[in-house]
């Protein structure tokens, strides 16, 4: 039995014996024979069951270019190392994304050139320069790897910059700034209590955040109680 007869027996319009797949419609048949899973199983099958030198596509890749020109393109694609059971499957492959992508890489690698022309890459260095702007007593030399204020680690400088530009870090930095301002007027005991529960002992009121506490200190009620104390 010839290898072509064996291939036709393995890959029919209604069933793929290599993958044990039932093919109901033409679209399902084309999609299956075009899939990477099918191609991988076919290569593995020919490795385990070599006939007439193995898979035609594999055999032709080891030969010179002049021999490859004599290959029937409706039976195999030497560029993608794939074999076909019919002209319909072959035509679908040549019009598909996988073949087009590999053909572009072979002819001149146009895809990498497009990525270098994008304006995204030159925008990254200026954003990196804005990282040291964040002033904090928790700032460390390796601030592009760790934020002591938020106890956050970073895998790269871009991730660090996104953190410093985020709401969470800015909110924590604002709290630290307020605590530093209040620290000049409060003693250490009051400051420690403030860090825990934001309570004003003069007005006997508890607040939910440092921002509310700071606003309360500037309010008329607190100022009146402070004068009457």
Curated annotation (Swiss-Prot):
SMART domains: ZnF_C2H2, ZnF_U1. GO terms for molecular function: DNA binding; identical protein binding; zinc ion binding. It comes from the Eukaryota. A zinc finger (Matrin-type) spans 14-44, 72-106, 145-175, 198-228. Keywords: DNA-binding, Metal-binding, Nucleus, Repeat, Zinc, Zinc-finger. It is found in: Nucleus. Residues 116-135 are annotated as: Disordered. It holds the Pfam family zf-met. GO terms for cellular component: nucleus. Its main location: nucleus. This is Zinc finger matrin-type protein 4. It comes from Homo sapiens (Human). The gene is ZMAT4.
């Amino acid at each position: 039995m010839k290898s072509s007869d064996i291939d036709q027996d393995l890959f029919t319009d209604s069933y793929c014996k290599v993958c044990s797949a039932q093919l109901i419609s033409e679209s399902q048949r084309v999609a299956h024979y075009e899939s990477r899973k099918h191609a991988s199983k076919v290569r593995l099958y020919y490795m385990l069951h070599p006939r007439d030198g193995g898979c035609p596509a594999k055999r032709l890749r080891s030969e010179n270019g002049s021999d490859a020109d004599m290959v029937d393109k409706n039976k195999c694609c030497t560029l993608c190392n794939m074999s076909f059971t019919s002209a319909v499957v072959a035509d679908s492959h040549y019009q598909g994304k996988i073949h087009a992508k590999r053909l572009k890489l072979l002819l001149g690698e146009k895809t990498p050139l497009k990525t270098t022309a994008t304006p995204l890459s030159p925008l990254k260095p200026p954003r990196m320069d804005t990282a040291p702007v964040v002033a904090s007593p928790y700032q460390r030399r390796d601030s592009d790897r760790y934020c002591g204020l938020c106890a956050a680690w970073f895998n790269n400088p871009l991730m660090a910059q996104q953190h410093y530009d985020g709401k969470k870090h800015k909110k924590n930095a604002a709290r630290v700034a307020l605590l530093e301002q209040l620290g000049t007027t409060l003693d250490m005991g009051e400051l420690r209590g403030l860090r825990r529960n934001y309570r004003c002992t003069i007005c006997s009121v508890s607040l939910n955040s440092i921002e509310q506490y700071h606003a309360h200190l500037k309010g008329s009620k607190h100022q009146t109680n402070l004068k009457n104390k």
